[in-house]
Amino acid sequence: MQNKPSFILRNPSANKGTGFNNEEREKLGLKGLLPPKVESLQEQSDRALSQFTSFNTNLERYIFLNCLRDRNETLFYYLLSNNLELMMPIIYTPTVGEACQKFGNEFRFAQGMYFASQDKGNIRAMMDNWPAEGVDIIVVSDGSRILGLGDLGTNGMGIPVGKLQLYVAGAGFCPTRTLPVIIDSGTNTKKYLEDKYYLGERHPRIPDSEYYPLVDEFLAAAFNKWPKVIVQFEDISNDHCFNLLDEYRNKYLCFNDDIQGTGSVILSGFINAVRSVQKPIKEHRMVFLGAGSAGIGVADCIMSLFDEAGVSKEEARKSFWFVDSKGLITTTRGDELTSQKKQYAREDYTYQLKSLLEVVRDVKPTAIIGLSGIGGSFSQEVIEEMAKHVEKPIVFALSNPTTNAECTAEQAYQWTDGRCIFASGSPFKPVEYKGKTFVPGQGNNMYIFPGLGLAASVCEAKHVTDAMIITAAKTLASFVEDSEVLTGKIYPGLQHIREISTRIAVKVIEKAYEEGMAQLPRPDNIEALVKSRQYVPSYDKSKN
């Protein structure tokens, strides 16, 4: 059955479309089923790019790309790899956010696997239904905190799907050995529970007493089925993500990109921002807006810079101020703090600061870092107040998607009179201000997670350690030259992502061997090993 010509043309991993040559068409029984012309992969890509640019909206472009992937996987990844800067905002932030919100309405075909609360006790058996022979990487979400959009439930599947497409394009994971997963534990979003097109289980989120055993069963089943797989947790709500990472990071090969990946990529940008302002790390005062998984993850990574400067953790924490919905986080505020917030709660405040503006006036920060998910929360008054006291303010407006950014790049440059070092989570176009062109930095996890995941997979790491995360950040930072840093550039161009991911993988593998985390016998040439494992989209299978 699977050798029928119709099956070959409908199998995205095998289909070449008009790329089948005449000999293949004869051998496979495809004569007459395709137009006569035989096209190269580049010719097919040129047409696909023309089709892509012809659509009027980014959501239409997103749907087109995913339909292409479901038709011809090789062509999709060839097109994506050669146009990554153009297409990354489509397959991932910010467009993927809209796609997730409209997942039920725009559903065309199933991708990945879904494990619901009703499947408890059957997850391992269900995994045998996955058609691929092996899996190297899983990205799993429960849909509870999708980007800055909140609880989308099963609609969040677009995030694991898009993330794995970036793993393939950025690092060279083999697409047939990737698995996107949704653990459907319900949703508390009334709109979706009442939406006739919603495809998930229609009940509120299950209690922790059921949730944690469900996740535990999933992980045990995954590592039983694929012992060398790496699992990346994605977009899981703050009330669960820290607990899951703490529970499993030393048991399985796994990491949380929202905590560790975000921390690593922002650490890299901060390293270069510090280089740019030419002020020692010990002299920086950092105000964070948002104390969730990403904010705490970033602060934990930045703490490593203080450690390298010989500053104790207790002393280093005095350089951090966290602001949440209730104001400055202090030990005397009177509310119940999570363990993550407690470690950064200020002990030296007998008075309460209720707003970000009050905190900025009080602290006079050198850096303000937004991971709040609240668009526009860096007001003109806040940024101008900060800029009064700092020659080169560091402004990181990192919330995704673009509509949730704390301020725009244009606002940051205007309100600081072009003096700030700016980075965002989603892309912004270059800004013209007073005759000068500013290119905003994008603190995109895409710089980190492909190379980090590839490293862990290639060397068969036992676990992903803090040292490996920090090594990835430092490697990324090294791609920006001193002369570029002084102009305000803090991240390299994404067009170099395969080179960046390869170098990060090599350096992280070296760190894994240094720490005794790598289980694969050490090769003579780590870089050669990494490159030998990287997928290249081609109809010549000898290249894959």
Swiss-Prot record:
Q: What is the lineage of its organism?
A: Eukaryota, Amoebozoa, Evosea, Eumycetozoa, Dictyostelia
Catalytic function, reaction form: (S)-malate + NADP(+) = pyruvate + CO2 + NADPH; oxaloacetate + H(+) = pyruvate + CO2
What is the originating organism of this protein? Dictyostelium discoideum
Per its record, how is this protein called by name?
A: NADP-dependent malic enzyme
InterPro entries linked: Aminoacid_DH-like_N_sf (IPR046346), Malic_enzyme_CS (IPR015884), Malic_N_dom (IPR012301), Malic_N_dom_sf (IPR037062), Malic_NAD-bd (IPR012302), Malic_OxRdtase (IPR001891), NAD(P)-bd_dom_sf (IPR036291)
Amino acids binding NAD(+): 145, 258, 400
The biological processes this protein is annotated with in GO are: malate metabolic process; pyruvate metabolic process
Cellular component terms, GO, for this chain's entry?
Answer: cytoplasm
Q: What gene makes this protein?
A: malA
Q: Which CDD domains match?
A: NAD_bind_1_malic_enz (cd05312)
Q: Write the record's keywords in alphabetical order, separated by commas.
A: Cytoplasm, Metal-binding, NADP, Oxidoreductase
Work out whether the entry's keyword set contains Magnesium: no
**Where does it reside?**
Cytoplasm
**Could you tell me where the Polar residues compositional bias lies?**
12-21
Positions of the catalytic residues: 92, 163
Q: Which cofactor does it need?
A: Mg(2+); Mn(2+)
Q: Which residues bind a divalent metal cation?
A: 234-235, 258
Q: Which residues bind NADP(+)?
A: 287-303
Asked whether the UniProt record includes Nucleotide-binding among its keywords, one would answer no
